[in-house]
């Protein structure tokens, strides 16, 4: 109640300064912290970013790690500066990505590991046991927000790319392909172990629903036809 009254009287900047914090921790905030707040706290302002910085700077690092078929990502705790995920690195905890893991599943994994890592790192920051390390700018990549339009794929693409797209776009916006002018969302897939000697888009099998791609084939385990409900690929 008292904090609410303070918010009414003061700007957020003034409130934070009045609290004289020991440290400011930012997680999945989505905005750049104003420069005037970066050095307000005794131990500075830190950010927990879910990638192996400088790889995947931006708002969708989890999704892009899956979309690109990476087998590993991580939790990076860094000092905030005026840039976008460009501050000095304090601590890195690698996180494995399973072959069929979706972005949603990876989010759950890195959230749990990130929380545990943050609790372990805060005392080390207070004790001065961590040495900030500059990011290697030549290795920097971006992870921009996803859009619905980006979710489309077609079977002229490699099977591995399509599988990664299905995983990476789940739970949002969900990968899809066009069939008879309608969107068919694919919520789960796996790579087929059988070779495909057919044109991309050809149905190789119905049980399980297997489609030929540019190279190899993909099994569509779960689909959602436009205007319909989610169903097994074999039922479509």
Residue ranges and their predicted role:
Residues 23-142:
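Donor/substrate-binding cores of folate-linked one-carbon enzymes
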Residues 8-9, 29-32, 192:
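Short beta->alpha connector loops
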Residues 20-24, 151:
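Short active-site oxyanion
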Residues 155-235:
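An anion-binding loop in the catalytic cleft
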Residues 120-178:
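Active-site-lining helix/loop region of Rossmann-like oxidoreductase modules
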Residues 2-7:
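Short, small-residue-biased leader/transition segments that mark boundaries at the very start
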Residues 11-20, 39:
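Short amphipathic alpha-helix with an adjacent loop that forms part of the alpha/beta core around
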């Amino acid at each position: 109640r008292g904090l609410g009254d303070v918010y009414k009287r003061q700007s957020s900047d003034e409130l934070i300064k009045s609290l004289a914090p020991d440290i400011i921790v930012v997680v999945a905030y989505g905005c750049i912290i104003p420069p005037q707040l970066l050095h307000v706290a005794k131990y500075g302002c830190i950010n927990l970013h879910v990638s192996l910085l400088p790889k995947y700077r931006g708002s969708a690092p989890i999704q892009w790690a899956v979309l690109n078929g990476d087998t590993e990502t991580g939790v990076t705790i860094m000092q905030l500066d005026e840039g976008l995920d460009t501050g000095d690195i304090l601590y890195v905890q690698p996180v494995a990505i399973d072959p069929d893991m979706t972005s949603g599943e990876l989010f759950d994994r890195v959230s749990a590991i990130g929380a545990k890592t943050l609790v372990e790192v805060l005392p080390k920051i207070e004790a001065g046991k961590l040495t900030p390390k500059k990011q290697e700018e030549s290795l920097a990549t971006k992870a921009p927000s996803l859009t619905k339009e980006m979710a489309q794929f077609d079977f002229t693409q490699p099977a591995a790319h399509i599988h990664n797209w299905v995983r990476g776009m789940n739970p949002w916006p969900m990968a899809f392909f066009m069939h008879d002018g309608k969107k068919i969302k694919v919520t789960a897939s796996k790579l087929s172990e059988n070779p495909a000697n057919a044109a991309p888009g050809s149905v190789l099998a119905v049980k399980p629903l297997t489609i030929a791609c540019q190279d190899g084939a993909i099994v569509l385990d779960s689909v959602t036809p436009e205007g319909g409900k989610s169903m097994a690929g074999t039922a479509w």
